Amino acid sequence: MNVVVLLAPGFEELEMVTIVDVLRRAGISVVLAGIVPPPIEGGHGIKVITDLSIDDVGTYDALVLPGGNPGYINLERDQRVLKLICEAYDGGKYVGAICAAPVSYTHLTLPTILLV
């Protein structure tokens, strides 16, 4: 399985690090894709070097969007993020959104989704 974690300025560092750590410990391939060039600064001043640009996202099985303020707002304002979310749903892929991140795409017309 290949997972892409999308990062925008103001992301919640704890939500990003936790999901990346747990998935990698489980042997799952995880890459960090940024909507801006690295480094990307989280909501609490921690800067992260992403693996690639959102423009270079290739094959993946799941997308993960960490929350954070203003991270979730920056995700919502980026049309490339919204396009990837729609493509993921259309392709039967998983989309995980943590904390405030589901707000990023509640305005999209998507099939019924499960929010936990």
Predicted regions and their residues:
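Intrinsically disordered, low-complexity regions enriched for glutamine and histidine
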Residues: E13, T112-I113
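Conserved small/polar residues in nucleotide/adenosyl-binding loops
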Residues: T106-T112
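Extended, subdomain-level signal for the structured scaffold at the beginning of enzyme domains
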Residues: M1-G91, V103-S104
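Short, thiol/selenol-centered motifs that function as redox-active sites or metal-ligating centers
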Residues: I98-C99
